[in-house]
Amino acid sequence: MSQLKLEEISSVIEEKIKNFELDCDMAEVGKVVSYADGVAKVYGLNGVMSYEVLEFETGDKGVAANLEEDSVGVIVFGFGNNIKEGTSVKRTKNLMKVPVGDAVVGRVLNALGEPIDGKGEIETNEFSLIEQKAPGIMDRKSVHEPLQTGIKAIDALVPIGRGQRELIIGDKQTGKTTVAIDAIINQKGQNVICIYVAIGQKESTVAQVVRKLEEYGAMEYSVVINASASDSAAMQYLAPYSGVAMGEYFRDHARHALIVYDDLSKHAVAYREISLILRRPPGREAFPGDVFYIHSRLLERAAKLCDEKGAGSLTALPIVETQAGDVSAYIPTNIISITDGQIFLETDLFYSGIRPAINVGLSVSRVGGAAQIKATKQVSGTLRLDLAQYRELQAFTQFASDLDEASKKQLERGQRMVEVLKQAPYSPLPIEKQVVIIYAGAKGFLDSVSVKKVVDFEEQLHPFLEAKYPQVLEEIHTKKALDKDLEAMLRKVLEEFKLTYSE
């Protein structure tokens, strides 16, 4: 037997050492020191990032919210019923991500982007961080394309443009959600993906919204994210950020999206709850000092991008609930100052039968005017002023009975215009039909129609136009303006219809 040479042995050993791979998992692990109300205090995770996802040995997950000198405050996603003192916590070295893209469209998800509609898993390789930097000034373009809601009072008086943030504000039970759902239903065929984020709502209310969207075929281009009242404060806090991450995907891929946050008052309350448990110092109304920032960084992500970035857009309709009409409370004033205008809904108007209950005097769109089509501008140019004068006259007539002819005429016209702006829920109207009926009211075609019959007049006018003069609607739709010929034809059509219309 030949003896092995010493060099050969050493070279074999050397080779083995070189090729040796240590196959083991490195994990940074900490321990729970205390756990209460959905917040865990964890010791031993020194290198953790802000808002990094952490895994508990119980299977629960959470995010690092407070980075203190000797411990980390972790917001737990669920209720963490099995977490107790001594539970191990592991770093994932990942920030919070949610699935994005066309795979999420038509689905109902929770705040973590997990499906809750029983239609199986979401099959996608595309994920996005829920916290992203908003586009800078140079990446944006001013709002100039209309986003029509199908609601006459909004499209005529407080128009919304793609990339705008328009607040819907009012007391509870004034129709705020209905306005938002109408806007979603009206996006059918407009190539706009809609995202509805329900924060702290009843499960039954959200189920009703989903049912309505399915009924009107809007679920085909919509995503519903639900963090209901029965979910933890952490889930309610994260839901809008998950929603906006999904919307941003379409915005950044040269497409258009609309996101509804229903509602940000409950979002602020959830954040207050988390902050107080994390022992952050409370400020006004016990909200933490950065409550303005949580909403500003959320709403700034809605934008109209410049042509170099693909000209996509993300439009936001945040909803805020007021208490007894008090718009000067902390959260309402914060969000009014962040957004580009507000639609103010009033209880008194709602109960007097004016629905949608939009207070035209307090509602405003700061940038939407540039996005309004010319035809709407032409017919509703003086509408806001006319309605304001009508309200003034109406108040005056309560203690003065004798009015001159001009004032009487103005009062009569005002009453009819209020009727024209009434609209049933879930029945958005195409812009060309809005132009026709507002034109009819503004130019006096309804003066001889009794106030109670104005709604009926409109209901009969649209089928008449579709059957006999579809070209009028078609021309308004394509030209987006009323020229002399089109206006003359519209007058002729309205006069003809008035002859056939019987009350």
From Swiss-Prot:
EC primary class: translocase
CDD domains in the record: ATP-synt_F1_alpha_C (cd18113), ATP-synt_F1_alpha_N (cd18116), F1-ATPase_alpha_CD (cd01132)
Keyword Ion transport: yes
Lineage per the UniProt record: Bacteria, Pseudomonadati, Campylobacterota, Epsilonproteobacteria, Campylobacterales
Keyword ATP-binding: yes
Protein name, as recorded: ATP synthase subunit alpha
InterPro entries referenced in this protein's UniProt entry, alphabetically: ATP_synth_asu-like_sf, ATP_synth_asu_C, ATP_synth_asu_C_sf, ATP_synth_F1_a_nt-bd_dom, ATP_synth_F1_asu, ATPase_a/bsu_AS, ATPase_F1/V1/A1_a/bsu_N, ATPase_F1/V1/A1_a/bsu_N_sf
GO MF, any single term: ATP binding
Organism: Helicobacter pylori (strain HPAG1)
EC nos: 7.1.2.2
Listed GO CC annotations: plasma membrane; proton-transporting ATP synthase complex
Pfam families with a match to the protein in the record: ATP-synt_ab (PF00006), ATP-synt_ab_C (PF00306), ATP-synt_ab_N (PF02874)
